Amino acid sequence: MKLRPLGRLLAAGWLLVASIAAWPQGDKVYAQHCSACHQPDGSGTVGLAPALKGEHWQKLSQDRTYLPLVVLKGLAGRITVNAQTFVGSMPPWAEQISDADMAELLTHVQALQGIANGVPYRAEEIAALRTKPGSPMSSLQLRQGILGAK
């Protein structure tokens, strides 16, 4: 069957809309839930929220569960990031962000950290971590264990 010009245009438009819908949404989820405190580029806010990039992430990214557990379960206590000390808490986002959106968000944060060839997070991976017990304090303990800090 031969498509007429209008048919071709409609088919092309449908394909464009379908492909846009399939684009990763991590940057949008990040903008909605994270950028107010951590800034759009992940540079953080002095005295409020630490940077999501810097030398500490080279170690933290070695434990693939760290970042999702912090976002799912929260983090509370004293941490030092890029020579700045933060004392506070980040709320858990498990109730507000779906597994699929969380996977996209975490993959976006990897990109902010310069982990261009990082393995993208998957919704199934987030779902499995969501069932694990955890709390803001357990996220702090995990962080301390990875970084070798007290």
Region locations from a protein language model:
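Bacterial N-terminal signal peptides that target proteins for export
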Residues: 2-13
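N-terminal signal peptide c-region/cleavage motif recognized by signal peptidases
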Residues: 17-21
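Boundary at the C-terminal end of the N-terminal hydrophobic targeting segment
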Residues: 22-26
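The canonical Cys-X-X-Cys-His
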Residues: 30-40, 90, 105
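Protein kinase-like catalytic domain
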Residues: 38, 72-75, 113
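Gly/Gly-Pro-rich "capping" loops immediately C-terminal to redox-active cysteine motifs
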Residues: 43-80, 87-98
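Flexible coil segments in periplasmic/lumen-exposed cytochrome c-class electron-transfer proteins
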Residues: 88, 97-150
